Structures are given as structure tokens and as C-alpha cells.
Amino acid sequence: MNVQEQQAIRKLLSRIERQTKMKNADNISRTNAYKAFYDRHPEIKWSLLASFVSRNAGWSMTDLKGSLFQLGLRERQQKWFFLAYERANWLIFSDAYPQLLLYHWSKRVGKPLFHLLHVFGVSQFMSEEWTRFWHERNTERLMYALIINEQNTIQTPIIQNPSFKKNVFDTIPFYLSDWFHFNTVIFPSSNGFFYGISVKRFSKAEERIRLGKQLSQLLFKPELFSSFYHFLHTVPHTGSRFDMEKMIGITKRTSPMLRTCYPELIHSLDGTKTDWFHGKIKKTFFRREELPKQIELTDWYLHKKRQLHALFAVEQWLKK
């Protein structure tokens, strides 16, 4: 490699680092960046899935400032829950977006640049999977690989982090949300129906990987995809759950827009990121998951909203 080529690579890496930092400012910018990347590279299905899941994360964040959760969570609990959502999604983006951009530039120059992924601390697992995709063009395998990677990326620094365990994942509110299936990812459609899947045992990486694969099957289900995409393409993401609730006739906003209630946070890796991959993963991780029988959740959603309101009302009464 000559001096000119070395300079070009350094310039490219610096550009990717700047773009990643800029797009990783908050939930809104991350969500929009994932969607924009998919629109340019529709073969990278994970990017659209990530945008939809990121919308859900934004809704969960602003729920904490909404009228329901203001009743049920103390201010300190709200801050810890928000920090867990924000930190996990920031960490996933900081790992995934450089991968997406290196793929973009690989296409531009006509040769794979995935040997540079290590510069951004990306797992050896993904370096191998991107190289495989470059040659085989198996879009579903790459989508699954990115799901596997993202959930393993957050397992140690977020899910198993002692502070987050104490203040979020081992708390009664979190156990209740797990038990009552409040940990549900919702995909609104443009024709006024909600679809989604719940996850239990959220702290288990295997369960979150399973959920991610099921969500990918749901999102790209031929008879539903165009309606999902129309929602994503026509409804701007504000972070408020009202973005989707107005699709089913709800007229009262119960959670604020994200940028009206949360400032941008300054994150750093703090030496917590290590390669989770140790040479082997379970073969079942690449196996397609069947969808649950019940995926249309419009009535279920309305019932759960009432149930959550009742739960917090009882908690408030007990505090008196």
C-alpha cells in the first residue's frame, strides 16, 4: 500500500467516525439514519428493522415522561430506565453504523473494506459475516448476523452491568413489565392496525436474538411490508407514542416529543467494549424463527394500556 492509499484510508476512517458521532446524537437521529441507509441499500434489511425497533425505544423513553409513568415511577427510577434505553441504543449504533458505512464505501470502490472494521472495535464475527455476504449475497443471514451481534454487544456493558442490574433490570417495575408483557415491540401499519411481538426474560441474549429474528419475519412479511413501510416513510419520528396511537383513533397525547424532554447525552465507551465473539456461536442462532400465532395486537394494545393505567393507580393508592 502506497502513501497515497494510506492517506485515503485514514481520511475515510475519519469521515466514518465523524458521521457516526453526528448521527448518534439521540434516538431521533439514530432512527432516521437507519431508515435513510435502508432506502439507499435495501439489501441490508437489518437497517430498516433497526429503524423500527429504534422507534419503539424512543416511545419507551418518552413514556417515562408521560402521564402514566409519572404516576408509577419515581424520578430517580425514570432517569435510570431512560439511561438504560439510551445507552443500549447508543452502543448498538456506535458499533453498527460504521459497519453500514464501510459496506457503502465497499460498494463505491468495488472491493470489500471489511478488514477495516476492527478500527471501530467491531467483532471479528461481523468481519467474517460481511465478507461472507459480499461473496454470497445472503441477505437473511446478514440480517440475522447483525441481530446476533447487536444483542451480544450490549449484554455485558448494559444488561449485566451492576448499576443497571440494580437500578433497572432487577427492579419490581421491570419484573412487572416482563410479567405483564409490556416489553412488546409494536409495528404500526398505515391502515390502522398494530402488529407486534412480546419478549419475556429480556435479560437473556438468546431471547432477544429470538425476538429480533421473529420481528424480521414480521416486518418483511409480504402481505404486511408495504403497510409498515408506508408508516415509516410518511409518519415523522418525534419519539412520542402518539405518532402511532393516532393511527388507531387515540386523540389524547400521553407522552411528550422526545426532544422536548431529553437533552443530548455525551457518551463514551469507557473501556467497556470488548469482542464478545470467542470463535463459536450456537447454530440455532441462524435458524429461522416461526412467528407467534397472534401478531395483530390492536385490541391487545388498548387493553394493555388500560391495564397499565390500573396498575399504576393501585400503586398510587397503596402509597397513600
From Swiss-Prot:
The lineage of its organism: Bacteria, Bacillati, Bacillota, Bacilli, Bacillales. It comes from the Bacteria. It holds the Pfam family DUF2515. This is Uncharacterized protein YppC. InterPro entries: DUF2515 (IPR019658).
